């Protein structure tokens, strides 16, 4: 009987830990594991339910369906497998979160990189035509955000035509 009580107690204590482990790692609620063992050591998660996050609770994303997760995961992993695990470790990227309708303050966005949390959130339906390009674009935001001291804005601007002006946001 004592062994049974110990087993029951350990089961009760361990079960909630697994459910909260993902949240404790990357501070995004309602995620489930999609794939953990990848050639480049990236860990893939998907939104099981919609989530809201951020200091101002202004970042939101919704869950998708299994078919979309499966199709888009194939594309995302094919593209990110181009990068070695050493490179991804150096730029501090470890987690990929898949969801739909990703927005910041109500404005839709293709992805949100967070180099501090080692995470890239990708909207699976933001732009079908340029989806693969978006993956690399967001990856380079991870690089830029993590190594700003290496990027000289004035040098970058010199590549533009002298009459070029960025549009107002």
Task: Pin down the residues of each PLM region.
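Classical Sec-dependent N-terminal signal peptides that target proteins to the secretory pathway
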Residues: 1-20
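N-terminal low-complexity, Pro/Thr/Ser-rich intrinsically disordered segments
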Residues: 21-56, 60
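Auxiliary, metal-adjacent structural segments of Zn-dependent hydrolase domains
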Residues: 51-118, 125-128
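Structural recognition of the beta-strand scaffold that forms the well-ordered cores
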Residues: 119-122, 142-144
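Short alpha-helix carrying the canonical HExxH Zn2+-binding catalytic motif
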Residues: 127-144
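Catalytic Zn2+-binding segment of zinc metalloproteases
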Residues: 139-156
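Metalloprotease/metallohydrolase-associated module, dominated by Zn2+-dependent proteases
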Residues: 158-169
């Amino acid at each position: 009987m004592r062994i049974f009580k110990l087993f029951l107690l350990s089961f009760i204590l361990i079960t909630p830990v697994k459910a909260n482990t993902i949240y404790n790692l990357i501070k995004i609620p309602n995620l489930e594991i999609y794939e953990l063992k990848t050639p480049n050591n990236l860990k893939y998660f998907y939104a099981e339910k919609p989530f809201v996050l951020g200091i101002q609770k202004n970042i939101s994303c919704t869950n998708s369906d299994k078919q979309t997760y499966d199709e888009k995961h194939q594309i995302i992993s094919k593209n990110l497998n181009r990068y070695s695990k050493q490179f991804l470790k150096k730029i501090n990227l470890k987690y990929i979160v898949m969801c739909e309708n990703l927005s910041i303050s109500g404005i839709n966005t293709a992805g949100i990189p967070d180099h501090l949390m080692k995470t890239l959130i990708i909207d699976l339906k933001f732009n079908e035509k340029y989806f693969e390009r978006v993956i690399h674009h967001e990856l380079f935001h991870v690089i830029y955000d993590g190594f700003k001291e290496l990027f000289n804005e004035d040098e970058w601007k010199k590549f533009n035509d002298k009459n070029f002006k960025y549009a107002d946001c």
